[in-house]
Amino acid sequence: MTVGISVEKGKQDTPPLELHYLGDKVLRQKAKRIAKVDDEIRTLAKEMLQTMYSSQGIGLAAPQVGVNKRLIVIDTDPENPANAPLVLINPEIKKFGQQLCPFEEGCLSIPGVHLDVIRPDEIEVSYRDEQGKPKRIKASGLLSRVIQHEIDHLDGVMFVDRVENEIALSSQLKQRGFALKSVQRIA
């Protein structure tokens, strides 16, 4: 699960990419598969990691920086220099575990909003790494949740679409200046 992309884990004064926020239509588009993993994709992944670290996040999907590609970056332990980030290109969940669990989620595209979302605790995911090699991992706990959250972004879904507590959702969105009409409930 190591990445061949070297990135300093720290906040930059000016992150290389600009985040997009709830209400921006780019976040609701289904991202396109990446046909070829090349230096352009590796550069994008590196800049996404730099932007994620600068924003104090643990995951970021390409649509969140206005890029309509199926690419996500994750680091569930950004304070630990020894923990290598993950780059997942064209990730696809192959299997969901049966145990569902609620957990509070937040999102760099909806700053300040933190609400419980119910998701499977375990998943199995296939993807290509930053060299274009096919990979498959089993993930549980926080890593599983972050992968699911970021893959949702690739499908135009945001975590607030999955929140069941409508009162808390409405309240937090309003407090942070986001419109409830931007939420697209998942049935």
Swiss-Prot record:
Q: How is the cofactor bound?
A: Binds 1 Fe(2+) ion.
Top-level class of the enzyme under EC nomenclature:
hydrolase
Record-listed E.C. numbers: 3.5.1.88
Q: Which InterPro entries match?
A: Peptide_deformylase, Peptide_deformylase_sf
What GO MF annotations does this protein's record show? metal ion binding; peptide deformylase activity
Cofactor(s), names only, from the UniProt record? Fe(2+)
Q: According to its UniProt record, what is one Pfam family this protein matches?
A: Pep_deformylase
Keywords linked to the UniProt accession: Hydrolase, Iron, Metal-binding, Protein biosynthesis
Residues the record marks as active site = E150
Binding residues annotated for Fe cation, in chain numbering: C107, H149, H153
Q: Which GO terms describe its biological process?
A: co-translational protein modification; translation
- Catalytic reactions on record: N-terminal N-formyl-L-methionyl-[peptide] + H2O = N-terminal L-methionyl-[peptide] + formate
Protein's job = Removes the formyl group from the N-terminal Met of newly synthesized proteins. Requires at least a dipeptide for an efficient rate of reaction. N-terminal L-methionine is a prerequisite for activity but the enzyme has broad specificity at other positions.
Database matches in PANTHER family = PEPTIDE DEFORMYLASE
Its family remark reads: Belongs to the polypeptide deformylase family.
Under what name is this protein listed? Peptide deformylase
Question: Lineage of this protein's species?
Answer: Bacteria, Bacillati, Cyanobacteriota, Cyanophyceae, Oscillatoriophycideae
This protein's encoding gene:
def
